[in-house]
Design a protein with these regions (language model features):
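Bacterial lipoprotein signal-peptidase II cleavage site
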Residues: 8-21
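Acidic, polar ligand-binding/catalytic clefts
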Residues: 92-158
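Extracytoplasmic small-molecule ligand-binding "clamshell" domains
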Residues: 25-115
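A ligand-binding cleft/hinge motif common to bilobed small-molecule-binding domains
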Residues: 103, 119-128, 177-178, 200, ...
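Bilobed "Venus flytrap"/periplasmic-binding protein-like clamshell domains
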Residues: 45, 50-52, 70-87, 119-123, ...
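Periplasmic-binding protein-like
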Residues: 137-144, 212, 219-259, 277-285
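Extended ligand-binding regions for polar small-molecule ligands
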Residues: 79-81, 86, 163, 170, ...
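Ligand-binding clefts/hinges and TM-proximal coupling segments of bilobed small-molecule sensing domains
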Residues: 13, 26-27, 32-33, 171-187, ...
Length: 285
């Protein structure tokens, strides 16, 4: 996950990146009656509260703040329901529970069947929980102030003349060097907060960061800013996976469901809808 509380609380194709517990299962083992569930006949899904867009949508209701995971709207809500359908569950058979981000991948028993909450796979986390294969590969993105010249750019080539800000040692920095190749050296900062401040103060024309961070920057940190676009890459290797109790055989069945959603184009359609069109982060080429 990106290092900001708002988005966990990133777009590239969601190609299969295997994680701990990341094998697929036979059809018979994944029949609804054979699934290893917290409550028989019900799929219990965890996520944090508040539930923020574009990962979740719908209006704030009852126990849920900002958005409502039960709406089926927003990227992660839509993915969860698509997986549930492949496993044989109706929408009414899916129960959402509140699980604080940091406890979702902590060691020990789980009250959920899987948790979906912009959780990045890491080897350390995978030692104590199972991860599904990737359902989202984190892209890089570019943030600009509205009304500036760069805000009219629609291709990567059009970014070359501008002063780009970035945190040193990040995949964002590497992407600038390898792909954008600006005509002037990027402004490099020790922290992302410093790079954000430079954009806010007009010292740079744009900020390059991962997409989840870009959502946070535009929503909270830099007034009158927007995501100009995202870059067609998953090259950083960072990806989000659903989290399960360690050893839960349901992991393999969810991987099988994800494989089907990737193969029939459903996962890409969900991503295009909620992270490009609705969220206003078009892909720049």
């Amino acid at each position: 996950m990106a290092a900001v509380a708002f988005v966990a609380a990133g777009c590239g194709g969601s190609d299969d990146k295997s994680a701990a517990g990341g094998t697929t299962a036979s059809a018979s083992n994944c029949e609804k009656a054979n699934l290893n569930l917290v409550n028989s006949g019900q799929l219990t899904v965890g996520t944090d509260n508040p539930a923020f867009p574009p990962w979740f949508g719908g209006s704030e209701k009852a126990r849920w703040k900002v958005s409502d995971p039960r709406s089926g709207e927003g990227f992660e809500s839509a993915v969860a329901y698509a997986v549930a359908q492949k496993l044989g569950f109706t929408k009414n058979e899916v129960k959402w529970i509140v699980v604080p981000f940091n406890t979702s991948f902590a060691p020990g028993p789980k009250k959920f069947d899987f948790d979906i909450n912009e959780i990045s796979f890491t080897p350390a986390r995978a030692k104590v929980v199972n991860f599904s294969n990737s359902y989202y590969n984190v892209n890089q993105a570019i943030v600009v102030k509205k009304g500036t010249k760069i805000a009219n750019a629609k291709t990567i080539a059009e970014l070359k003349p501008y002063k780009l800000g970035v945190q040193i040692g990040t995949t964002s920095y590497q992407y600038i060097q390898d792909n954008i190749k600006p005509s002037q050296q990027p402004a490099v900062y020790d922290t992302n907060d410093a790079a954000v401040a430079a954009l806010k103060n007009g010292q740079t024309d744009a900020l390059v960061a991962d997409l989840p961070t870009a959502f946070y920057v535009t929503a909270v940190q830099v007034p009158n800013s927007k995501i100009l676009g995202q870059f067609p890459t998953g090259a950083s290797g960072e990806h989000f996976g659903m989290v399960f109790q360690k050893g839960n055989s349901l992991t393999a069945c969810v991987n099988t469901a994800l494989d089907k959603l990737k193969a029939d184009g459903t996962l890409q359609q969900i991503q295009d809808k909620w992270l490009s069109k609705v969220a206003g982060a078009p892909v720049l080429k």
